[in-house]
Amino acid sequence: MLPTSVSRSLYLKTFRSHLLRAPQIVLKRMSSSIDISKINSWNKEFQSDLTHQLATTVLKNYNADDALLNKTRLQKQDNRVFNTVVSTDSTPVTNQKSSGRCWLFAATNQLRLNVLSELNLKEFELSQAYLFFYDKLEKANYFLDQIVSSADQDIDSRLVQYLLAAPTEDGGQYSMFLNLVKKYGLIPKDLYGDLPYSTTASRKWNSLLTTKLREFAETLRTALKERSADDSIIVTLREQMQREIFRLMSLFMDIPPVQPNEQFTWEYVDKDKKIHTIKSTPLEFASKYAKLDPSTPVSLINDPRHPYGKLIKIDRLGNVLGGDAVIYLNVDNETLSKLVVKRLQNNKAVFFGSHTPKFMDKKTGVMDIELWNYPAIGYNLPQQKASRIRYHESLMTHAMLITGCHVDETSKLPLRYRVENSWGKDSGKDGLYVMTQKYFEEYCFQIVVDINELPKELASKFTSGKEEPIVLPIWDPMGALAK
């Protein structure tokens, strides 16, 4: 019998104390193999339960997502009325297809609103492929640098094994987007689109790059172990490897048409059917037309494992050598919600990261944690957000854009949000989703706002230079890359 709630704390403390001192034989007594005789007993018990019989009949004939969908709840939550929205329509609906570029789409979709407004355009996209190309190139080089800096660790160490797992995966973080734009700028998609196959279906390309990078990792670690290998040898090896990675990339993608400081010419037609010509560079286009000041955006997260009001840094996570580290400010959900409202009121969309597709109905475009009636089959989910993070049940997997919300007049908090995804117009309702506040609280992990939109006490966390961040290892769930 489990202890009462009154004695639970003392019980757990005593249990842990005994467990730490327990010899192996005691631990062995606690193991439990499957008792075959109990299987028949369990089966008879469940077969005599009419509720269980009904549930198993349905689930053996239908997809669980279809069978358990609460359509009454769905109809109630599928409300597309929003009283706080950005003024510019974000068109066309974008589609990352079979690639993990959601973070690049969400970030460029946020900035394209500025271009649409600035140039009086009906439709526009920034080139996601342009950033994708350089992200791959930079990530490969960043990986090689991490291999060199971790050469003192055993090949079987958790760090080295983690680095080797996915050296150039598609996913990323907003700070990694900023690192790319600072170095390479932005260009219109008209100049560099998604035509190469591997841009929109990157699995095989990633596999080949990963294989080559693991080979390079062994070469570097072997060279570093040889006492005769001085710095110049490693530098030469690195340059040879960079060249080979670039060669491989040029096989799968076109080389971007311009250098960051090289001028390009772009012709376009505005809403009034007037033809215009722009001469600009990628770096100038990012600042002049996309209106991006890379020093302004900051990331905030909700991680209930750690104290609120603290900076959190992810060790070794990045893409561009010498670029900014991945740093967040940890805040409560109410603060996140209020900042979303404030930013939307400033006519700016909100980049956010969530655990997708948890509790997301792709057919109708509704995100709600009560959308499926799992309790009807006795399947309950009692874990809280902090526990889900600790036990690898929840993490940020996808980035999207909040372009509107419906604010309650009394609480001044959102009741629901309008979400722009990057899975094409056939996902959700013409590419748009409605997300409930409860979903936001449970499965939203990150938002990006401008530092001047923060209260002074929060902004100072980033600017004072006095805040020592909590440093989490690269494999921590908060270091997950949105795809």
Swiss-Prot record:
Propeptide: 483
Regulation: Inhibited by E64, a specific inhibitor of cysteine proteases, N-ethylmaleimide, iodacetamide, and mercury and zinc ions.
Residues forming coiled coils: none
Catalytic activity, reaction form: Inactivates bleomycin B2 (a cytotoxic glycometallopeptide) by hydrolysis of a carboxyamide bond of beta-aminoalanine, but also shows general aminopeptidase activity. The specificity varies somewhat with source, but amino acid arylamides of Met, Leu and Ala are preferred
Annotated Gene3D superfamilies: Cysteine proteinases (3.90.70.10)
Record: active site: 102, 398, 421
Transit peptide stretch: 1-30
Record-listed E.C. numbers: 3.4.22.40
Superkingdom field: Eukaryota
UniProt enzyme class: hydrolase
Entries under SUPFAM superfamilies matching the protein: Cysteine proteinases (SSF54001)
One GO term describing the cellular component: mitochondrion
pH curve summary: Optimum pH is 7.5.
An example Gene Ontology biological process: response to antibiotic
PTM comment, free text: The N-terminus of isoform Cytoplasmic is blocked.
Any one Gene Ontology molecular-function term assigned to this protein's record: double-stranded DNA binding
Key words, A-Z: Cytoplasm, DNA-binding, Hydrolase, Mitochondrion, Protease, Thiol protease, Transit peptide
Subunit comment: Homohexamer. Binds to nucleic acids. Binds single-stranded DNA and RNA with higher affinity than double-stranded DNA.
PANTHER family: BLEOMYCIN HYDROLASE
Purpose of the protein: The normal physiological role of the enzyme is unknown, but it is not essential for the viability of yeast cells. Has aminopeptidase activity, shortening substrate peptides sequentially by 1 amino acid. Has bleomycin hydrolase activity, which can protect the cell from the toxic effects of bleomycin. Has homocysteine-thiolactonase activity, protecting the cell against homocysteine toxicity. Acts as a repressor in the GAL4 regulatory system, but this does not require either the peptidase or nucleic acid-binding activities.
Note: Present with 521 molecules/cell in log phase SD medium.
Family stated for the protein in its record: Belongs to the peptidase C1 family.
Protein name per the record: Cysteine proteinase 1, mitochondrial
